[in-house]
């Protein structure tokens, strides 16, 4: 599907845009941020994230648990920002790669918790004890803030 869309865009003359260098520079700075901080224990943060998501945002969830999880996810973000990686060779740097992956996992965990809070029903692998009914199945649903 993506390939067909790209081909159609090219035929219409949409081509490609030049990258916004301010955005590129900001993302490089964000990616390199852990080198400016004293190395810390990201493994403990990862273990806490796994337990938190299972306990409060797992298959069986409720508003109280997901709200609690969102607060703790903010704490984990802060903890990760304070736990840098050793500054050295940046090629094949597994510590840096793990740190970046963990940051992404925390960000995606926040998205999952926010989206699950918006759903006031239970279906499939999403069961809310405070909304146990499945409710009507909409042909298409969009979750908006």
Predicted feature descriptions by range:
Residues 1-145:
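Glycine- and aromatic-enriched mobile tails/lids
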């Amino acid at each position: 599907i993506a390939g067909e869309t790209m081909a159609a865009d090219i035929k219409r003359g949409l081509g490609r845009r030049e990258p916004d260098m301010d955005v590129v520079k900001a993302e490089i700075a964000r990616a390199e941020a852990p080198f400016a901080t004293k190395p810390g224990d990201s493994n403990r943060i990862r273990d806490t994230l796994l337990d938190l998501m299972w306990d409060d945002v797992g298959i069986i969830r409720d508003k109280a648990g997901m709200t609690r999880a969102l607060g703790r996810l903010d704490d984990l973000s802060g903890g990760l920002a304070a736990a840098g990686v050793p500054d050295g060779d940046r090629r094949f740097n597994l510590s840096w790669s793990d740190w970046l992956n963990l940051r992404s996992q925390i960000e995606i965990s926040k998205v999952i918790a926010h989206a699950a809070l918006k759903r006031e029903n239970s279906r499939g692998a999403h069961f809310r004890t405070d909304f146990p009914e499945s409710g009507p199945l909409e042909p298409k649903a969009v979750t908006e803030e």
